Amino acid sequence: GGNSRGLLALSSRQGMHRFGWMFAYGLRRSDFFKLKKTDVFFTNSFTQGFQSLVNEINGKPKFIVLEDDYPSISDSLKKNNFDLIYVKNDSNIEDNIKNAIIKFNPDFLAISVVQWIDGILIDNNFLKSLKLEYKNLTIIADGTQFCGTCNFNFENSPFDVLISSGYKWMLAGYGIAFVLIKNNF
């Protein structure tokens, strides 16, 4: 309907702007990551941003998550009693993810772009191929270990949402994080 821009209701987006998800600072970030300035929000950490985001998701969707991924991902999803499908994080990570998608038909893939435990970078081309093949799959990414390491165009990425703490490679210090949301979410 008219009040929705995808899964996240317009009122939720407006609330994010009112309650600390500072819009003005998003202007520069939008240029840096190549996205619309209205799709950038700020929060104090990845964990807070992710938890706030998943609190807005209704129903009981299925999420694919990686074993040993950043604990805030699975912890936040468990708190909301979502169905979690754990995928083994090993040398066959891409096959493991794709096989789980085929078998379980999840609504979401929640994943760190770079795994915090071993530094494995998830291939964006692999994720793009998943988005092309599985049109209803929504990808939410933790970009904390990734953002700032290379050029990144959010609009051309496979991610529907990317959340990143700024303390890692963005040199922002603790207490600064950002949420990038595509219009279809």
Please provide the spans of the model-predicted regions:
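Active-site PLP attachment segment
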Residues: 157-185
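Residue-level detector of structured alpha->beta connecting loops
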Residues: 81, 105, 135, 158-160
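Short glycine-rich, flexible loops that bind phosphorylated cofactors or substrates
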Residues: 72, 116-119, 170-171
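Conserved beta-loop-alpha segment that forms the PLP phosphate-binding cup at the N-terminus of a helix
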Residues: 17-29, 35-61, 71-73
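Active-site phosphate-binding strand-loop segment of PLP-dependent enzymes
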Residues: 93-144
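A glycine-/small-polar-enriched, mobile loop at the entrance of the PLP active site in fold-type I
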Residues: 1-24, 31
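Substrate-binding/gating loop at the entrance of the active-site cleft, primarily
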Residues: 44-47, 65-82, 90-95
